[in-house]
Amino acid sequence: MKQLESFEIPRTVIFGPGAISKTPQVVAKHKAERILIISGKSVTANYANEVAHLLSGYSVDVVRYDEVDTSYSKYDLVLGVGGGRPIDVAKVYSYLHRAPLIVIPTSASHDGIASPYVSYALSQKMASHGKIVASPIAIIADTTVILNAPSRLLKAGIGDLLGKIVAVRDWQLAHRLKGEEYSEYAAHLALTSYRIVVSNAFRIKNFTKEEDVRVLVKALIGCGVAMGIAGSSRPCSGSEHLFAHAVELLLGEKNNEAIHGELVALGTVVMAYLHGMNWRRIKRVAKEVGLPTTLKQIGIDADVAIEALTTAHTLRPDRYTILGSGLGKEAARRALETTELI
């Protein structure tokens, strides 16, 4: 008999033109007095200040993500306004101090805008605090704001969504071979997000209209809900993400060109090949929307790619994927050459 299950998902999701103006109504539901707004460094700081102005009746501090003192516990509500880093730091603060979290994304480059989890790099850095899990109580996605984000970031959001088909296949494999717990519902949600973006990819690829962003945001939020239901990032992060993380770790500070969602899209192609899936279709969609289809296009040489593919399985030994116990260098080279990623 299965044991008791529980999960947390956002209670309130508001998205569309001008959604940011609804922030006071959302905040009012939570009886907060002292509010911390965590922002980015540039344009996102302007949006954070706009939110602070809307909340002028409260005690509000706006702090850049790289200046937040996570040990300071005086706030009873935290808002993450910006892209990945401000939202991740807001999740950390929320987790450490049990402060409710509201996410206000200014871009849509990955599914972190709705998930309870932080990036791999930050989770490793914060490992001494345990697994960082902070499900947003609300997501306010102003599609007018997101439409103004660089189109490359929005296309990276499509890249991140392409990965869901491999992530679910990896999860199914782990369920069959290792007896890992599997949620059909969470997997279906993740795959639905993948299908939504693939079926609309050609129409939305230029992100010239609000409705284009709306499709992307809906799909990314669906992924966040899938992870909340699964109780892990499993339905949305498999071998394709391990490859992306491995590349990012190898490049470190030298990574000046590659965006996470772009790496995920490329990882999806090679992992689909290893799974025996139709990797050419995935690559065709990536090309249609203007995502890179070779590693060279984003400044990654063959040696780094091969090293990443042979070491990716070591990043999360607890997460079984198509990589199994790892690929040898020749097998990795062959996979990357066959898929014409190098």
UniProtKB/Swiss-Prot annotation:
Cellular component terms per the entry's GO annotation: cytoplasm
CDD domains to which the protein is assigned, alphabetical: Gro1PDH
Binding site for substrate: 111, 160, 245
Protein's GO biological process: glycerophospholipid metabolic process; phospholipid biosynthetic process
SS bonds (residue pairs): none
UniProt source species: Pyrobaculum arsenaticum (strain DSM 13514 / JCM 11321 / PZ6)
GO MF annotations in UniProt: glycerol-1-phosphate dehydrogenase (NAD+) activity; glycerol-1-phosphate dehydrogenase (NADP+) activity; metal ion binding
UniProt keyword terms in alphabetical order: Cytoplasm, Lipid biosynthesis, Lipid metabolism, Metal-binding, NAD, NADP, Oxidoreductase, Phospholipid biosynthesis, Phospholipid metabolism, Zinc
Keyword Nucleus in annotation: no
The protein, known as: Glycerol-1-phosphate dehydrogenase [NAD(P)+]
InterPro entries for this protein: G1P_dehydrogenase_arc (IPR023002), G1PDH (IPR032837), Glycerol_DH (IPR016205)
Main location: cytoplasm
Catalytic activity: sn-glycerol 1-phosphate + NAD(+) = dihydroxyacetone phosphate + NADH + H(+); sn-glycerol 1-phosphate + NADP(+) = dihydroxyacetone phosphate + NADPH + H(+)
Binding site for Zn(2+): 160, 241, 260
This enzyme's EC code(s): 1.1.1.261
Subunit structure: Homodimer.
Top EC class of this enzyme: oxidoreductase
Pfam families: Fe-ADH_2 (PF13685)
Cofactor(s) required, per the database record: Zn(2+)
Location in or out of the cell: Cytoplasm
Function according to Swiss-Prot or TrEMBL: Catalyzes the NAD(P)H-dependent reduction of dihydroxyacetonephosphate (DHAP or glycerone phosphate) to glycerol 1-phosphate (G1P). The G1P thus generated is used as the glycerophosphate backbone of phospholipids in the cellular membranes of Archaea.
Residues that, per the record, bind NAD(+): 84-88, 106-109, 115
Pathway(s) per entry: Membrane lipid metabolism; glycerophospholipid metabolism
